Amino acid sequence: YLILGVIIGGRLGYVIFYNFFYYLSHPFEIFFIWQGGMSFHGGLLGVCLATYIFTQKYNLNFFRYTDLVSLAAPIGIFLGRVANFINSELYGRETDFIFSVNFNKVDNLFRHPSQLYESFFEGIVLFIILNFLWKKFSEVPGVISSLFLIFYSLFRFIIEFTREPDAHLGILMNIFTYGQMLS
């Protein structure tokens, strides 16, 4: 359920949130997931829907299961952002910061390794925070998944300031990326 939710939701999220008019003109390309184009926010919605369907089918507590998914999600985020770094995807803005990286596959400029910032904060730090808080709040369904959403959104919003905006979307209101608005 979750794998289908993240793949279908991630793809549809990218289509709707990031490139709607392109796919409106090229609807069959929606199915070409090997060409890239996934959205975390769409994947999140897909996972929520898949979890809802699963918990309804088996008469289980929805928020208890979203808590369990939220405990594991940072591992997937960590691995996904490391893969983005390796593939020179979703790279950061140009900088002379000490931790800058030359993405020679892109343009041979030194840039923020924003994927690594995200893998650290949205992956490792979020995993530690949620698993620590699980000990205190495991008996209250929905608390951990709510904290996941709060911390993920906070980390993503801040780190997006170092990330290169999507070329076809640019900056919104002269300051925010589309990812920040969705977060």
Question: Where are each of the predicted segments found?
Answer:
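A feature for loop-to-transmembrane-helix boundaries and adjacent hydrophobic helices
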Residues: 1-183
